[in-house]
Amino acid sequence: MSEKYVFSEKHPGPLVVEGKLTDAERMKTESNFLRGTIAEDLNDGLTGGFKGDNFLLIRFHGMYQQDDRDIRAERAEQKLEPRHAMLLRCRLPGGVMTPQQWLRIDKFAGENTIYGSIRITNRQTFQYHGILKSNVKPVHQMLNSIGLDALATANDMNRNVLCTSNPIESELHQQAYEWAKTISEHLLPRTRAYAEIWMDQEKVATTDEEPILGSTYLPRKFKTTVVVPPQNDVDLHANDLNFVAIADNGRLVGFNVLVGGGLSIAHGDKETYPRTASELGYISIEHTLAIAEAVVTTQRDWGNRTNRKNAKTKYTLERVGVDNFKQEVEARAGVKFEAVRPYEFTERGDRIGWVKGIDNKWHLTLFIENGRILDYPGRPLKTGLAEIAKIHKGDFRLTANQNLIVAGVPARSKAKIDALAREHGLIDDSVSEQRKNSMACVSFPTCPLAMAEAERFLPEFVTKVEGIMQQHGVGDEHIVLRVTGCPNGCGRSMLAEIGLVGKAMGRYNLHLGGNREGTRIPRMYRENINETEILAEIDRLVGLWAQDRLQNEGFGDFVIRTNIIRPVLDPARDFYD
């Protein structure tokens, strides 16, 4: 079951919102193309953090300043500042890296971060948590030495470009991946600030220009995907700009373009809402960059710079109308959209385990719970991946489900890699389908926005859900379950069959009614309830689903069909009904 979203064409709003600009716009204007005084701040040893505008400017360089919230109160009692440390997120379009790159990334995590871990994110890249100020410059230089960077992985730019992790159809995946890289490069900022600050490159006497992003960059974050049906592993409806691959005899010929998805909301603010992306039409492959640029520049010029909570592309589309936005994109690109070509999504989970590609090479998708790579007692995952990287000749591919694919394994190496993976706990045949299809954002202790636990809450919570599933005779099946520690949506709960959104410590809003394909937004079913209440609801509803579902009917479709909850059809207008 997949409802058709209806977007009203009654859009009285202006193309450009007038009014006082947010302070973020002042900060960008005065930053000298994202330089600020970051270089000087690096030399200030009196604080472990960045001061003033630099606190926000470092985000354009791929970093967030955080502190350990588990010890924040204790340090305050001791009259100490919070233990500031940076999160750094790598730019890795399509999630592909070499084993040699992985070994350097692994080494830095072990030697130069507080937590010693690598976190695979659902933005198909990795991030470090706990980088002290003294290690900030070295991490950028390390990434540069292996051909990577952290530019534009945060703040008001086009973020890391996602691409379907499809190891089966190798040729089609490769074409999609090349486009993900090309789009990422095309939409990067042109400022030399990153190279000057982190790579010590000399300042040149030329004026910086940003022909695509503009001198004040975008009004808000902007996310892009390249997706190969029938897999929707990238969760395209969480993204501003999506290129849905259309193939002919296994060759990529063009894309359906969908614009304006996004999941972030603010508790208590009904002017914010999640939204699925709208179809603009089909383009042939040679128009890809022109359309990408036109969508970005239209959002650059029409996006709301007076209110950051209403600044994303989804709100621009609702204000000006999809047709007006589409016509502007066509005019800027010099390209007319054709009618959308047929496509269908059937799943979005990863194929865990070994699969054979059409090129006769093998691909091993490893389930990494929460994407957290660390040596756990009895499960030395981090060591195991390093051992595999030492002998593997293909790629490592990170997925948007926070897993890792050891890709391109020749038949002669399969047994050795399988043995290493099992020896280090990277393959566990007992992992349930439910656990494989559950996901959480990071939340506590490092995220400053966290309201409730997510990553640390999920494993034990899933164990309890597994027990409920077993009790009702559906233990071999799964419900797409997502937990996010606040309403910003990083855990993508707003595209789950069961979505938990953090409200306060130990309390969540319970959303129901998304679907397995990730094309429907779930509606809030219960507000501000604790784990015991959540599990009681899941127990009751899973019991009904197990007893009364149709053949192959997913949980989310069941609760809609049986009127347990109404579907969200026009999120801007009926999400809060």
Swiss-Prot record:
One of its GO terms (cellular component) is sulfite reductase complex (NADPH). One of its GO terms (biological process) is hydrogen sulfide biosynthetic process. Keywords: 4Fe-4S, Amino-acid biosynthesis, Cysteine biosynthesis, Heme, Iron, Iron-sulfur, Metal-binding, NADP, Oxidoreductase. Binds 1 siroheme per subunit. It holds the Pfam family NIR_SIR. GO terms for molecular function: 4 iron, 4 sulfur cluster binding; heme binding; metal ion binding; NADP binding; sulfite reductase (ferredoxin) activity; sulfite reductase (NADPH) activity. Pathway: Sulfur metabolism; hydrogen sulfide biosynthesis; hydrogen sulfide from sulfite (NADPH route): step 1/1. Its cofactor is siroheme; [4Fe-4S] cluster. This is Sulfite reductase [NADPH] hemoprotein beta-component. It comes from Pectobacterium atrosepticum (strain SCRI 1043 / ATCC BAA-672) (Erwinia carotovora subsp. atroseptica). The gene is cysI.
